[in-house]
Amino acid sequence: IVANGETVKDGVIEFTVVNPILWNTENPYLYKVIFTTPDEVIVDRIGFRTITIKDAVIYINGEKIKFRGVNRHDSDPKTGFVTSVNQIKTDLTLMKQHNFNAIRSSHYPNAPYFYQMCDEYGFMVIDEADIEAHGPFMLYRKEDTDQNRFHLWNEKIADDPAWEGAIVDRVQLMVERDKNRPCIVMWSMGNESAYGCNFEKALKWTKSFDPERITQYESARYRNYDITYNYDDLDLYSRMYPALSEIEEYLEKDGSKPFLLVEYCHSMGNGPGDFEDYFQMIHKDDRMCGGFVWEWCDHAIAHGEADNGKTIYHYGGDHGEIVHDSNFCMDGLVYPDRRPHTGLLKYKNV
């Protein structure tokens, strides 16, 4: 039944489920909810679960958890950035078969059916706002030093109030749209966009709207050291590609928040060669809540067949583009057609 396109009344409906069966990755139990009005019927499936942090340890339904996660981009060798329900089903099935239990929607909210399928298949999800300043920052870069890079990165976007509306709005749209999905256990403010007053505002709104779910933002560590920032609404200390010694140092000297590897073991070439070392570290301390491998699939476009019948894939300048990432988009655990790389087999074994 199609609605007539107008909101007649807005409000909150409360109902109680006595002794609900709790949703988790091993038993992703869902309840069917049907909302009926004279002009519209909405059917949804929802789940119940709890999220808590105590002594820098994350608990789901009262049980300590480890994120065995992977970063996933929308990518299909035939349809590009548009991924179908069947393609996502293929991805999720392969992930389950290779012992993943979590996905980061790097670096943007996915189609609604992705989350519905994660609810059903039993994946914990980091839902990430579509905020990415890695590229725009290059417009402002002067002398290429760490100090100048981090200072300008903050000053020009993250710490410029002119960007507040754009940043907060994207976070709000994500949270409002996806708030009822049990698979989402964490909100991410975006990717590689530094830190400043705009992200403080986004975090504060998120925590006030949804105080239970975890908040994370790896770029919070990129800051202007001349300014004191507020990190009270940030639940995790997350890093990309830290050495094992850096993790040990954090746990020994600080450790006040759970440590998350939001990206690690970059899977280009032999990049996944240190899975076992990181897994030993992850399971060594309960404050290490796990990590998300970079990344799921190679990004390339199918471009016909070679004489031997094998598919030809184009990427990194193969279409004559001047600006491109060379082979840097070929860094997945699976080929574009989802055949496993050796790295995926190693991950399952570890």
Regions flagged by a language model, labelled:
Residues 168, 183-187, 197, 207, ...:
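Substrate-binding clefts and catalytic carboxylate motifs of secreted carbohydrate-active enzymes
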Residues 120, 155-256:
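Active-site neighborhood of glycoside hydrolase catalytic domains
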Residues 68-73, 81, 128-175, 179, ...:
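Aromatic- and acidic-residue-enriched carbohydrate-binding clefts of CAZyme catalytic domains
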Residues 108, 130, 190-194, 211, ...:
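Catalytic metal-binding/acid-base residues of hydrolase active sites
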Residues 68-70, 103-105, 125-127, 185, ...:
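Hydrophobic faces of well-ordered beta-strands that scaffold small-molecule active sites
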